[in-house]
A protein has these predicted regions:
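Short aromatic-glycine-(Arg/Gly/Cys) micro-motifs in beta-strand/loop hairpins
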Residues: 63-97, 172-176, 189, 203-222
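Intrinsic-disorder-associated interaction segments
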Residues: 3-16, 20, 101, 105, ...
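Hydrophobic alpha-helical segments that drive targeting, anchoring, or assembly
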Residues: 42-72, 84-105, 109-118
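Generic alpha-helix signal with a bias toward terminal, lower-confidence helices
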Residues: 33, 114-117, 124, 211-216
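Intrinsically disordered, low-complexity, charge-dense segments enriched in Lys/Arg
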Residues: 47-48, 52-54, 58, 133-223
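Surface-exposed beta-loop interaction hotspot
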Residues: 96-156
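Generic structural signal for short, flexible, solvent-exposed coil/loop and linker residues
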Residues: 3, 90-94, 135, 193
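N-terminal "first-domain core" detector
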Residues: 1-75
Length: 223
């Protein structure tokens, strides 16, 4: 990890995110929803790739032309971006889109882990209701405040999403009532996922494991 990234992301936070992600990628590989790789720093960005490393060994051009996907955490001065990179089988070019901005690396990590955990819950070998739908039905925790995005917030998104009118209408800032400095900036369709702001990693793990078969839970030992 380069020095600039180390200044922005404390090592203990890196270790915590990697530890919980390792738990969930192990579950993904167990249920056949993987393979998911270990987190990997590349040019100051943390990649959480799926269907990548083994095929890269078999075909060196897989990085450029393969159909792998990845969540990417990018530390920027003052905030943390989470993007999704994907190349569909029939598309010529890979797409990458910024999805959420957080004030905290840990919250960015929880977002990525929630996405992986929900993909496991809804995969064909598990078939549970997604946490997203559960949270959507219940509504956000009262400890999370929802506000219209500021001009500065909108500026972050239109730099990469290039749709100011849409952002002005749909972009929101979600912050903890008791800790306004802990926030996420996202389009309103992401609102249920902003519940992660109010959860610890252990609480998120318990929510994702809820209802899973014993064949999975018996192999899980969160530390």
């Amino acid at each position: 990890v380069d020095m600039e990234v180390e200044r922005q992301v404390p090592r203990d936070e890196l270790v915590e995110v990697a530890r919980y992600y390792d738990l969930w990628r192990g579950i993904a590989n167990l249920v056949g929803d993987g393979p998911d790789d270990e987190p990997d720093w590349d040019a100051g960005r943390l990649f959480f790739r799926s269907d990548y490393s083994q095929k890269l060994k078999e075909w060196p051009k897989w990085a450029e032309f393969g159909d792998w996907g990845a969540w990417i955490i990018t530390p920027e001065p003052g905030y943390i971006c989470v993007s999704h990179s994907l190349k569909h089988e029939r598309e010529v070019f890979r797409t990458e889109r910024m999805e959420v901005v957080f004030s905290s690396f840990l919250d960015a990590g929880k977002y990525v882990i929630m996405q992986l955990g929900d993909s496991i819950r809804t995969c064909s070998n598990v078939r549970l209701k997604s946490l997203f739908l559960n949270w959507e039905a219940r509504g956000l925790s009262p400890g999370i405040k929802v506000q219209a995005a500021s001009e500065k917030d909108i500026g972050l998104f239109i730099d990469v999403r290039d749709d100011k009118e849409y952002a002005e209408k749909h972009l929101k800032r979600y912050s903890l009532v008791d800790s306004p400095g802990s926030y996420g900036i996202a389009l309103d369709y992401e609102q249920p996922r902003m519940e992660i702001l109010a959860l610890s990693f252990d609480e998120l793990t318990a929510a994702l494991l809820d209802g899973m078969p014993e064949t999975i839970t018996s192999k899980v030992h969160p530390r």
